[in-house]
Amino acid sequence: MKNQGRLAQNSDECEAKYIYIQDLPSKCNDDLLEKCDTLNKWLNMCEYLTNSGLGPRLNYSTSWYATNQFSLEVIFHNKMKQYRCLTNISSKASAVYVPFYAGLDVGRYLWDDDDIKIRDNASIQLVEYLKEKPEWIKMGGHDHFLVAGRVSWDFRRQTDSVSDWGNTLFNLLEVKNMTSLVIESSPWSNIDFAIPYSTYFHPSSDDEIYVWQEQMRQKHRPNLFSFVGAPRVQLRDSIRNEIINQCLGSKGKHCEFLKCDGIIKNCDEPKNVMRLFKRSVFCLQPPGDSYTRRSTFDSILGGCIPVFFHPASAYVQYLWHFPKNYTSYSVFIPMEDVNKGDFAIEKRLLEIPKEKVVAMREEVIKLIPKVIYANPSSKLERFEDAFDIAVKGVLSRIEGIRMDMLRGNNNNNSNFESFPEEYSWKYNFFGGLENLEWDSYFSRG
């Protein structure tokens, strides 16, 4: 597949920013799109992969789409084709983008107890192909990056049992040399980095963002807090049931609950979800099947202050996109507090001074451009979107590794120092290993 898009014209503005798109066999991307009806056991993905991966346009706006949360690698690829510093001379590039649709590939097999060789086949063939390319030899793959539009755990199968989850993409030695972008990273790894889930809003101009931000500032928010989701009865440690009970039992009728289940399909309609977020001051974001939720980014888009219960739901994930000062834009309530049974979320939120709430909401609204992916067919002039920030993060990381290799240090750490990989979350967020604040959340003993 020929992947080159708009090539850079001005070499000065692109110094240290050039990216080369690696040509891959069509089975790595285009063929998957052609077989879109086979990509998900429960859902026909074909309509969601239209419009450059944005999905079908919603009736009520030209910039709103029914975007599927697992179509990010297609969106990213189409935006990369319009990247202003593309080059078709690989030796000139600071980074090499590998447009393998890893998430679409593995999604075909996640719920099947098939031969694990089928799950791993495309990933193994990819690295065998890359190793033979001259671009790989330059840095042994350390300057390569890919986007896998699912959570990290889908690519980290721990055993060769057919009942174990996922494939082994991130376990391959060659891929460990690369930088992988996912919608949820492993806190104990230094090869994958989280970037925002896609929202429904894909503006084509800066003015659309300005208008939306101002609308969110002016919104009347009758709900103190809200929750969009479903119970997790099968997850023993889940706090969702307690959160739902507290929302439904709010003494001042301060909470609104939008139940997501397979019968009513309330949450499949973007208008329902966004309506609730726009009516709420705070939006509860407990872990679900994994640490993170697409709902976090939809709520930010709605100007709603997120409330997190685990630091891996946002703080140690989206290091390039969210402020390090997490109290400026969110509320953190430890999971163990909620599990005590006598802790009232409503009371905790009511204790926050009004002026603090106003300041937090403004920070959330400022985050909106950073968590949306603008329409690939357009270019923002004054804002950097989630794609722009991710590319800057990748280039910075690769440059650091390149300088490290020149100094003779080849540890592949994003902060260019040697530390145990299991403490990646701590080093990347706190800048060192001494802080003990969140150790209990990440202990694997």
PLM features per residue range, with description:
Residues I116-H220:
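Catalytic core of nucleotide-activated saccharide and alditol-phosphate transferases
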Residues M1-S91:
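Signal-peptide-cleavage-adjacent N-terminal segments of secreted and extracellular proteins
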Residues Q9-E15, V331-G445:
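C-terminal amphipathic helix plus adjacent low-complexity
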Residues K219-R232:
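Conserved donor-binding/catalytic core segment of Leloir-type glycosyltransferases
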Residues M1-L7, L72-C85, S123-K133, D154, ...:
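Short alpha-helical segments and helix-capping/turn motifs at coil-helix boundaries
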Residues Q213-H220, E242-F297, L301-I305:
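Donor nucleotide-activated moiety binding/catalytic core segment of transferases
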Residues N272-I372:
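Catalytic binding pocket for nucleotide-activated donors in carbohydrate/polymer assembly enzymes
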Residues S26-C28, Y101-D105, V151-D154, Y200-H202, ...:
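Short, solvent-exposed loop/turn segments at secondary-structure junctions
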